[in-house]
């Protein structure tokens, strides 16, 4: 029996950052912005199935707080796991 996927919840600040990044890229290259948004979405979906996928940061304070991160192109996506929510 498989475990259900974890829920992925973006903080409001993360949503704002994501929108700003996609808008910035779209100003010069709309198709690249769409590809970036799709790549981030696919990585978040993968993370919901495999929450240990991300790397452990080198900064010990972040490690103590339970942070991990994904590298998506030139961007870092930091996350924590709280119960069944990322």
Language-model features, listed with the residues they occupy:
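Basic/aromatic recognition patch in beta-strand/loop cores that engages polyanionic ligands
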Residues: 54-86
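Basic, Lys/Arg-enriched alpha-helical interface segments
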Residues: 1-67
């Amino acid at each position: 029996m498989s475990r259900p996927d974890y829920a992925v919840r973006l903080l409001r600040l993360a949503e704002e950052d994501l929108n700003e990044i996609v808008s910035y890229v779209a100003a010069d290259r709309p198709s690249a912005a769409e590809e970036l948004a799709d790549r981030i979405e696919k990585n978040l979906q993968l993370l919901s199935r495999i929450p240990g996928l991300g790397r452990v940061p080198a900064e010990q304070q972040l490690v103590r707080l339970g942070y991990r991160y994904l590298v998506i192109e030139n961007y870092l996506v930091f996350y924590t796991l709280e119960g069944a929510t990322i």
